[in-house]
Amino acid sequence: MTRRLYPARLTGTVAAPPSKSAWHRELICRFLAGQPLPQELSGADVSATLSGLRVLRQGGDAIDCGASGATLRFLLPLAMALGRTGLHLTGTPRLLERPLSAPYPVARENAGYRITEPLTPGRYALRGDETSQTVSGLLMALPLLAEPSELVLTTPLVSRAYVDMTLDALRRHGVTVLTTETGWRIPAPPVFQPD
């Protein structure tokens, strides 16, 4: 088959899909605002987050994080803030070798983590030179609690752009997080709103 192409001036705009990092945060904020979630997404990491959010919405007892560190580090504190004690988060052996970098009340069992207590309001101290995903996970989970909390960095933050991406997603969904000299203060309980 032969096709002829003729020169033409093209106009319009193309919406580029968000990055994987932005999608994780957007999905979580949509979930917390009570918005519908997409049916499916391309990419194993964001698909793991989408599946995990469905488990949280529908009341399942386990979340498979696959190989996604972001899914584990974002959904673990979120599930704790939602009071999902007993929930089991699993993943690939390689994922589960990586540290959580936060003192969460979880039990290590059956190739994963089981939540033993809910997340409570308070002061959380984290190292800023480890993964920013732990910081972002807490920034998205702490607004769900009934009282204010504080997130303090004990070392300088190395991945500020990812934390800024989280703060931007929260702002777009109606949640204000206050920046302090050493971290953030999270007033509670704000209400997540549709973007």
Regions found by a protein language model. Name each.
Residues M1-D195:
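Structural preference for solvent-exposed beta-strand-turn elements
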